[in-house]
């Protein structure tokens, strides 16, 4: 089995405390270079693309340069999701790597930085010469622009000298091209799943275990990138071989269930993101 991508949580530490990001009691840590090397060696026959996040701010990793050097050493394509606050300070590092294939910037992050938009947009303009940039905004409901979304769009219009009709495009479309290699993606805000109460919903599917799996900072392997608490732990990358994990009873049950449009786990039944995407 091969996956289109595997999520690796290189740190679960963040420099912000956004209200839409769920809280947990996990030990705050980052993967050591030795641990990251082990992870890459164990997954390289299963994917060639990795996302350097589940929770946490990946650019906060104290050995970011060395982390990216390891991804280059093992020929991985890398995609990064960031809140953007550290982009300017990490620009020189990010520019070194041709294997970074996309940077997603969550513009909806809650920060008090006076020059946030200016610094993010100017830095991304430089990065976009070689790396696709996707700005992301979260909407409250039914793709309607709230106050913060409107502020973000106004700043985009101002910086990129966009026509005022751009606002209508944002309202009507999910994905908009701003300029070469720079895009805006919008989606409804979702709740991180942690409800494991049973309910009557038993029909549905998802891409977890099918297109991807995730590895948390403590090594726990989970079915999807939203199981940040390791509720559906399948194994541990430092203790188990991935081949064995993918043959485990729980993995096969979840995987076959999604193929059959059947929800086999309570976490999946209560996943707000999955419901928005697949139970429309």
Residue spans for each PLM region:
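Conserved alpha-helical substructure of the radical SAM core
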Residues: 1-103, 111-118, 278
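Short loop/turn microsegments at loop-to-beta-strand junctions
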Residues: 209-211
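Conserved strand-turn element in the central/C-terminal portion of the radical SAM core barrel
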Residues: 110, 126-158
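Structural recognition of alpha->loop->beta junctions
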Residues: 44, 91-113, 150-179
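Short cysteine clusters
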Residues: 14, 18-21, 206, 224-225, ...
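C-terminal accessory region of radical SAM enzymes
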Residues: 127-132, 158-201, 226-276
């Amino acid at each position: 089995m091969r996956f289109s991508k595997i999520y690796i949580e290189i740190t679960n530490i963040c420099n912000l405390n956004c209200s839409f990001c769920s809280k947990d009691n996990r030990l705050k840590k980052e993967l050591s270079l030795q641990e990251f090397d082990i992870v890459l060696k164990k997954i390289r026959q299963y994917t060639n693309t990795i996302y350097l996040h589940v929770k946490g701010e990946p650019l906060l990793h104290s050995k970011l340069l060395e982390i990216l050097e390891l991804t280059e050493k093992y020929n991985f394509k890398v995609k990064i999701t960031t809140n953007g606050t550290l982009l300017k300070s990490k620009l020189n590092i990010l520019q070194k790597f041709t294997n970074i294939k996309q940077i997603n910037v969550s513009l909806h992050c809650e920060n008090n930085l006076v020059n946030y938009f200016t610094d993010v947009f100017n830095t991304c303009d430089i990065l976009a010469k070689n790396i696709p940039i996707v700005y992301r905004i979260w909407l409250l409901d039914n793709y309607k622009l709230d106050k913060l979304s409107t502020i973000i769009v106004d700043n985009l219009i101002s910086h990129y000298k966009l026509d005022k009709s751009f606002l209508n495009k944002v309202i009507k479309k999910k994905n908009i091209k701003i300029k070469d290699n720079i895009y805006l993606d919008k989606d409804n805000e979702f709740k991180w799943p942690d409800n494991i109460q049973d309910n009557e919903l038993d029909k549905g599917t998802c891409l977890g275990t099918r297109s991807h799996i995730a590895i948390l900072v403590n090594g726990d392997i989970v079915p999807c990138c939203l199981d940040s608490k390791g509720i559906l732990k399948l194994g541990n990358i430092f203790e188990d071989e991935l081949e064995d994990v993918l043959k485990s009873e729980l993995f096969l049950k979840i995987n076959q269930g999604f193929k059959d449009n059947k929800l086999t786990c309570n976490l999946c039944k209560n996943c707000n993101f999955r419901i928005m995407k697949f139970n429309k």
